Structure formats: C-alpha cells, structure tokens
Amino acid sequence: MNYTSFIFAFQLCIILCSSGYYCQAMFFKEIEELKGYFNASNPDVADGGSLFVDILKNWKEESDKTIIQSQIVSFYLKMFENLKDDDQRIQRSMDTIKEDMLDKLLNTSSSKRDDFLKLIQIPVNDLQVQRKAINELFKVMNDLSPRSNLRKRKRSQNLFRGRRASK
C-alpha cells in the first residue's frame, strides 16, 4: 500500500462521519476494517493536511455542497474500483461503504444512482465519447445557465401579478 491510499481511507472515515449523518455501528466497523488494511491510523497520514474536509468546510449552501460531495464520492468509487482485493473482508467493507455513500448522496433514488454510476463510467479518453460530448456541449452549457431559470421565474411572476391586478 502506498501513502496516498492511506490518506484516502482516512479521509473517507472523516467525510462519512462529518457529513451530517450519524455513523452507524455497521459502517464504523467497515471503516475500521479499511483503516487497519491501509494502516490509516499511522501519524504520517496527517502530513500535508486533509484532502476533502477543508474543501467541504468552504461550502455552506446545500446545493453547492452536494456538487462537491458528488465529486468526492466519485473519487472514492474510482479508488475502490482500482483496489479490487482478494481479501473478502476488505472487498465487503468497500462494497458496503460504496452502497452507503451512494444512498446518502442520492437520497436512495435508484434512477439517480444508475445515472450517477453511468456518468462516472464514461471513458474520457475515447475519441467517440469526446466527439459526442463536444456535440452536446451547447445543450449542457444552456442547462447550466441560471438565465433559463430566471426567465421561467419572471414569467411566472408576471402571470401571478397579472391575475392579481385583474381582481
């Protein structure tokens, strides 16, 4: 195991416990299992500061925080995917934590979960994928734009005012 893996396991423990959810005994046991496997309790793990906790502290609004959390969860899912292990206990611990992270992030919505997993599996180095992504870029950028929501809000406000004025 390398130093980076140790840090990741330690950060996972911190994120799961500090994200506003209560640590259940089952998940605590699984996290302890991973900490032991990665030797994440070693004092040198703290060298260089935290990976994610300080970033999470910077974001106060729930919607903004959810965006950051989705990136962090994506990171852990990829890390666990790369750490396929023959040790059944460790693999079970990683699978249990993956399930819980996704459930908490996506509020146990199976369709959101499927879409999230589909998105993180898209290979970014594939030329065909890149071509499709560029082709869809304008639509994605429009969807990200707050103007479309502002226009809808203004229209609904004008309709409401019009009804009120006619009474």
UniProtKB/Swiss-Prot annotation:
Locations listed in the record: Secreted
Keywords linked to the UniProt accession: Antiviral defense, Cytokine, Glycoprotein, Growth regulation, Pyrrolidone carboxylic acid, Secreted, Signal
The keyword DNA damage appears for this protein: no
Residue numbers bearing the Pyrrolidone carboxylic acid modification: 24
Any Pfam family the entry gives: IFN-gamma
Signal peptide region: 1-23
GO biological process: one example: defense response to virus
GO CC list: extracellular space
GO molecular function, one term: type II interferon receptor binding
Superkingdom, taxonomy of origin: Eukaryota
List of glycosylated residues: 39, 107
Family as reported in the entry's similarity comment: Belongs to the type II (or gamma) interferon family.
Main function: Type II interferon produced by immune cells such as T-cells and NK cells that plays crucial roles in antimicrobial, antiviral, and antitumor responses by activating effector immune cells and enhancing antigen presentation. Primarily signals through the JAK-STAT pathway after interaction with its receptor IFNGR1 to affect gene regulation. Upon IFNG binding, IFNGR1 intracellular domain opens out to allow association of downstream signaling components JAK2, JAK1 and STAT1, leading to STAT1 activation, nuclear translocation and transcription of IFNG-regulated genes.
Subunit (UniProt): Homodimer. Interacts with IFNGR1 (via extracellular domain); this interaction promotes IFNGR1 dimerization.
Name listed for the protein in its UniProt record: Interferon gamma
